[in-house]
């Protein structure tokens, strides 16, 4: 599936500086020829290799529920990965992350478009909820709230306001509580 949306972008124009223009952003599933671009994207966005190593390990171990990329003029400018996450009673849900957007393309809504597209695909697939460890001032824009309010704790020692959950199916969510455990790839790579 391809989702095409329009986004504002600052485009350099010789002699005029940067102009705000509407450009088509394509959101699609990752393809094998995107792997190198995604690795470079992670390195540039995070300033290190750890997140790229996690993405590579998840992909290599078949632990990806959904992997979307955002492209601008056929160039990968963002990506989002969802992987399985288990809750105490053998319940599997989706963990969002890593997600990255090229530094020069940030603050243009690309990350938001990736989150919205990915969350909708998971909702359509019947996923009860999505967990994220992320910025407390960013993810609530998309409906994420502290997971502790639903009786779910993170296996890692992280502040309550950065361990968040987005409910996709309230009926399936009612009986769920416990300790959320990420896949081993998140703690076994550096």
Positions of PLM-derived features:
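Conserved acetyl-CoA-binding loop-helix of GNAT-fold acetyltransferases
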Residues: 96, 107-120, 132
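Short amphipathic alpha-helix that is part of the acyltransferase structural core
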Residues: 14-54, 61-77, 170-190
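Conserved glycine-rich acetyl-CoA-binding loop
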Residues: 75, 89, 102-113, 125, ...
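Conserved beta-strand in the GNAT
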Residues: 67-69, 75-85, 92-100
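Short hydrophobic/aromatic beta-strand or adjacent loop that forms the aromatic wall/cage
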Residues: 65, 161-164
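Conserved active-site alpha-helix within GNAT-family acetyltransferase domains
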Residues: 124-128, 133-159
């Amino acid at each position: 599936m391809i989702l095409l949306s329009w986004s504002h972008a600052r485009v350099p124009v010789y002699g005029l500086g940067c102009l705000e223009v509407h450009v088509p952003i394509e959101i699609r599933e990752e393809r094998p020829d995107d792997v190198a671009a995604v690795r470079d994207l992670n390195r540039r966005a995070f300033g290190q290799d750890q997140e790229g190593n996690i993405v590579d390990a998840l992909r290599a171990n078949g632990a990806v529920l959904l992997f979307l990329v955002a492209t601008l003029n056929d160039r990968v400018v963002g990506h989002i990965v969802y992987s399985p996450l288990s809750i105490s009673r053998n319940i599997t849900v989706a963990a969002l992350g890593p997600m990255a957007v090229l530094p020069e393309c940030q603050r243009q809504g690309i990350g938001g478009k990736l989150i919205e597209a990915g969350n909708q695909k998971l909702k359509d697939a019947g996923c009860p909820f999505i967990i994220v460890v992320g910025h407390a001032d960013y993810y609530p824009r998309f409906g994420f709230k502290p997971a502790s309010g639903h009786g779910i704790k993170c296996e890692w020692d992280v502040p309550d306001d950065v361990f968040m959950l987005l409910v996709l199916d309230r009926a399936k969510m009612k009986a769920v509580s416990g300790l959320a455990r990420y896949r081993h790839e998140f703690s076994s790579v550096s």
